Amino acid sequence: LRGAAAFEEWTDADTLVYTAAAPAGENVDRESMAVEEQDRTRMTEVLKQAKQKGMKTVVLLNISGPVEMADWLPYADAVLCIFIPGCMGGVAAARLLTGLAEPGGRLPVTFPIRYEDTPAYPNFPGEGNDAYYGEGVFVGYRSYAKRKLAVQYPFGCGLSYTDFSVELCENDFRWDMRTQETLNVPVRVKNVGSRPGSEVVQLYAREEKPHMLRPDRTLVGYAKVRLAPGEETIVNVSVSKKALRCYDARMDKWVQPIGAHKLYLALSAENILAQAPLMIEGKNPYPLNGESTIGEILENPRAKEIVNQFTNGMFDMIPKETLDFMVYRKLNDILSVGMIQVIPDTVKLSAILQGLYDRLAEL
């Protein structure tokens, strides 16, 4: 149903298909997340009337990006987001709706509940000719996860005409980046439905103790698998080093974090099926030195031991309650003040501290 077509003309049908639009383009940004005006004024009412008549209702979203759906979604039995599919989009949509083809795609964006929920909302459209991108690293699904904000449909979401069981084949992962370029994560997938179909297995990861502000989880790998009814397979989802890199503005370069991570098996950014620890080994982009915090030193048993050797057991002498208040203090600040009283010769003290920092950098 579209344009001037009258709903009354469709009273002999058992299913109503409503196509809604929300066009946009380069230099034609939308001012809201609403569908077109003609759809906004009649869409909810038409769907509501169809449901009252006992009809099935389907909404085709011929859109350029996410739209608000709260007003009409309760009256839609199914929603097929075709975005802007081109001149053969109608044929493709018909094949999908009639079951001749399967909707195997997954959302490349998040559909928020309200326009005001979007991470760009406070800064858009900017002032004059200036547009301020204030989201930082929290773009898209990363922002909603960080704010623990409910969404209409999450990034990576999508259905097919069958069901799948998806599970990790292992429950613990180690990755030595010095010898392995990629990490292969085996996932068992089975089509437990009655039709052939496809599933997109997604892997997200988070660094347990990041050195900077990081998203709660980031997509690091995915794989699409198509299976017949009852068919089962193991798919290896490949994770590259690049997928785990992050940019450190203080160091003005890309860094490769190592250490403890969490790996998430998911079917969307919000539909987490399982999680497993991931320990990454490699060259530390943040070698321990005088600029390291007391907390970072204490997290490394070997580093704590080295500091104790150079300071006659400093960490063993300081009460735990006091150490808890010092975790964010820099090691150099603590040692410079504390050791100058014992070693007033600044040249000798500097040599001792440099020796300590050299030992820490070797870890």
Language-model segments: residues:
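C-terminal non-catalytic regions of proteins with extracellular/luminal or membrane-system context
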Residues: 1-363
